[in-house]
A protein has these predicted regions:
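N-terminal core-binding DNA-recognition domain of tyrosine site-specific recombinases/integrases
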Residues: 55-62, 86, 98-173, 191, ...
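Basic, Lys/Arg- and aromatic-enriched nucleic-acid-binding interface segment
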Residues: 155-157, 170, 174-176, 180-238, ...
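N-terminal DNA-binding module of tyrosine recombinases/phage integrases
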Residues: 26-31, 37-135, 293-307
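DNA/chromatin major-groove-contacting recognition/catalytic segments
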Residues: 261-266, 363, 384, 388-405
Length: 405
């Protein structure tokens, strides 16, 4: 199998070049390098070329030379990198990463399962992790978008895969993370920004709801969403005990979610900053007062996670959840746009939150105060994500400052 030694005892290849320790040449001309990996196992690598400058034999598949491979192996051995990425595939790596993420919220857990299901169906998921290069990672994300996945969906997928590969780097399974690049430089951001609506549109929307025979019963709830900036999960989680009419405050310390299996659960607020006490304006106070006065007492108060007395119940006596309100908003917009020539843009509970934040910013509210009211852990979110200020807003503010107002 191996090239024999010469008179001096030095092993040579068929071109009479001296072979180093561990190197050999097979009878078919292919070179081999034998070494012991970090696990104490004997391994072999092969190449048709000894040096980078060697000519590739006719009909053979191109590959880097044996000595180039040796350099990479020696470097990995020196740095304690596990050979071949521990023979782990992308799917196995992501699964291992997800299994270590214990105690996460149910929405996060559902997101992890979705990512694993996607990777399971992709050939990329069967690739060995040490074989994945940045160009492979980019190509896969581009493929996902061509397959019809949205930017936000791909952003979520990468949000799981990238830290999984970082775990592999930290575990010395691979040397570099192939997903360390900006997503926007690879695929087109086709996501639609959820814009705040104007004050005029807000007034028209609320007026329409108030005067509509069917939707009027939701007016107070919708008004509160527009005037408090509450997350819809926080709003539907409010109970009678959370509404302090005497001190005119709203105690926000949890949220209500319904899982895909229709299980109702109480969770902590989205962030620590989400736990807050909000003051009521006079009109918000009146809305809460009417909600409590008009709330029909059910035969049996539902209890979710130790909480009872939810403000809005559905026809089955269960607490209303985000989906109920999203449907109400959808139907309101559809009916409005069937009646009026000037169309109302898409309004959702989250648009109410955007609109509240934008209106407060335009009114000159202190950013730290606004951050508290919104329940943002990072003021950058308050300033960059939720405030949609136009040129006209900037012009008005500049004139106000210039006039010393």
């Amino acid at each position: 199998m191996e090239r024999s030694t010469n008179m001096s005892g030095r092993r040579r290849d068929h071109k009479n070049r001296i072979l180093r320790n561990g190197e050999s040449q097979r009878k078919d001309g292919r070179y081999a390098f034998k070494y012991v990996d970090t696990n104490g196992q004997v391994q072999f690598v092969y190449s048709w070329k000894l040096e980078k400058t060697d000519k590739l034999p006719a009909g053979k598949r191109d590959d880097i030379s044996l000595r180039e491979k040796e350099k990479m192996i020696q470097r990995d051995l020196l740095d304690g990198i596990v050979p071949h990425g521990g023979e782990m595939t992308v799917l196995q790596l992501v699964t291992k990463y997800v299994l270590q993420k214990t105690g996460v919220r149910h929405n996060t857990e559902a997101g992890y399962k979705t990512v694993i299901n996607i990777i399971t169906k992709e050939s990329f998921g069967q690739q060995r992790i040490d074989k994945v290069k940045p160009s492979d990672a980019r190509a896969w994300l581009i493929k996902l978008q061509k397959d019809g996945r949205s930017y936000s969906s791909i952003h979520s997928i990468r949000g799981v895969v990238r830290p999984a590969f970082q775990m592999a780097v930290d575990d010395d399974l691979i040397r570099k993370n192939p997903f360390e690049f900006q997503l926007a430089t690879v695929i087109v951001n086709d996501s639609v920004t959820r814009e705040a609506i104007t004050r005029k549109q807000e007034r028209a929307f609320l007026e329409f709801v108030k005067n509509d025979k069917h939707f009027a019963k939701y007016y107070e709830g919708i008004y509160i969403l527009f005037k408090t900036g509450l997350r819809i999960s926080e709003f539907v989680g409010l109970t009678i005990q959370d509404i302090d009419l005497q001190n005119r405050t709203i105690n926000v310390n949890h949220q209500l979610q319904r899982t895909r299996t229709m299980e109702y659960i109480i969770e902590d607020t989205k962030t620590n900053a989400g736990t807050r006490i909000l003051p009521m304006t006079d009109d918000v106070y009146e809305c809460f007062k009417r909600i409590l006065e008009n709330r029909a007492k059910p035969k049996l108060e539902p209890m979710i996670g130790g909480k009872t007395g939810f403000l809005y119940l559905d026809k089955n006596g269960r607490p209303m959840v985000a989906m109920h309100w999203e449907k109400y908003f959808q139907h309101i917009c559809q009916k409005y746009n069937r009646i009026y020539r000037v169309q109302m843009p898409k309004v959702t509970p989250h648009v109410c939150r955007h609109t509240y934040c934008s209106n407060m910013a335009k009114s000159g509210m202190n950013p730290k105060t606004l951050q508290y009211l919104m329940g943002h852990s990072d003021i950058g979110v308050t300033l960059n994500t939720y405030t949609h200020l136009s040129f006209e807003d900037a012009e008005t503010e500049l004139k106000r400052v210039a006039n010393g107002e």
